[in-house]
Amino acid sequence: METSSIVQKPALDEDTLRLARQVFQCVREGDLASLQPLFDHGFPPNLRNESGDSLLMLASYHGHHDLVRALLRAGADPEVANDRSQTPLAGAAYKGYVEVVRALLDGGAQVDGHGEDGRTALMVAAMFNRVDVMELLADRGADLRHRDASGTSGREAAQRMGAEDAANWLRERS
């Protein structure tokens, strides 16, 4: 008798799916009061949606620094990238959320961590002219000369995006 090595994930029932949708909506809205009891009772902090976005990614992307801190305390992994190879730190850098970036770094995010594309949070911040985020990342030890998987530097990426302040900032420091 031959057994298959393929293991299928069990289908989730409608109640479980409804709860997951509600949790993701609470995260987008920053509703920590509704979420904290779930985290206190062991709700999985690394839950991901169909796009690969973790709860931490969505909280970071929407600028909810208190929720980011709560998720990190509950055990969320700050290095989990989504299906587009973006880390929560890169998402917060893209949006320019300095306090979220600070919370992620305080919670263990690697300052030069990156997804498969090799882009660090500093590179993303540079591309979108988020100089205040770049300053925080540099203060925390970010590599100003890092190159992504295609060999592009943060300064080159900033120049291509027309982010002159960021490109000048990097030129002055590297």
Task: Name the predicted role of every residue range.
Residues M1-H41, E50-D53:
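Intrinsically disordered, low-complexity regulatory segments in ankyrin-centric signaling systems
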Residues S34, D66-L67, E99-V100, D132-V133, ...:
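Conserved ankyrin/ankyrin-like repeat signature
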